[in-house]
Amino acid sequence: MKRSAILILDPRGNISLGGKDVINRHLEYAKNLYSKSDRHKLVVCSTSYQEKRTFYSKFMDRYILSKPTFNPLIFSWRAYRRLRKEKVEVSLIVVSDPWESFWTGFFLVKLIGRKVPIQMQIHGDIADPLWRKINWKNRIRFYLAKYSCSKATSIRAVGQSQKNNLIKNLSLSKSKITIIPVPMNIKALNLKNLRIAQRPKSIALIGRIHQDRGIWNFLDLINKLNDVSRDFDVIIIGSGKAESEFLSRVKLVIPRQRLQILGQMSEESLAKMWNKTGVLVSLAPVESYGRVMREALISGVPVWALKSSGALDLISEFNSKTVRLIDLNGSAKALMKEFESLIRVKPDYKLRNKLVAENKSLVSMLVNSWLNLVKN
């Protein structure tokens, strides 16, 4: 029996770049898809600087077509030729952004020569007015997204505030947008009971080290805290374009014996760091969901966040004392007082249980959204 494909297009190679964790997440999607409909198979057309192979399995095929590219015309042509060679019949195209990935899907539909629905996945809060003000590239991308979002069959968002921004600022209909957060790897997290006495006096920044992720806000924060007390450690996990300059400036503030710089980590390695983390800070001016914030809360680590869609959704949905907004304009003493208060706050097990329960259904929700588009 011929199986049709749910096709994921990844011209910039984000799936390959994400490594084993991201690939395994897509494999979970594929297994869930097979359990619901053995007539469909997940196929990923991706790129990579390192891999040049094709990966086949019972549940998912992954084709590495080239090095990462920003050219949707070239990548759509390569994808089309490969799909014809593999005799793949595409029933749905899933794109990962409103730009290169969407236009790859748009041109691929033209090459296929028949109507194929396109689901656009938007993880960032691109419709937040603050996002387009970060730099001139974002302003251009905002207006490009306004057009491409109107052309997509369906849009998968990751949070309620993000959806509200898409509706309000991109003039999209409610019915076009489905909220399905990115699943967490709960198996890797420590779900044992946590005592406050075990929480270390440390502050952590986790994620991409890019200009738009609030890294200079973090530097200002640890500067202020350091002016009041030297009795805390700093943990930095992640990598990115601004890594060299940022870390050099952090080292001028925090001595080596109080500083852990751990680079990019796998989900399993990151999970082991939560028991060494006192408070997680999230200082990106625009945050749509905050998967790391949720992983921290499940692990019993309180979150100190700048006001964003992701933080506001957490606060409004769960009303927990373990999630607080940070006032970066506050005095050094006021910030230290808030930091020490968070170190002592009790873990919120009710919140943890809700997040774990919510996470269980996310893979199935995403796959169902694909099958519904195929049926329609």
Protein language model regions, located:
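Nucleotide-sugar donor phosphate/pyrophosphate-binding loop at the beta->alpha transition
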Residues: 17-24, 74, 117, 127-147, ...
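Carbohydrate-associated surface elements
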Residues: 161, 183
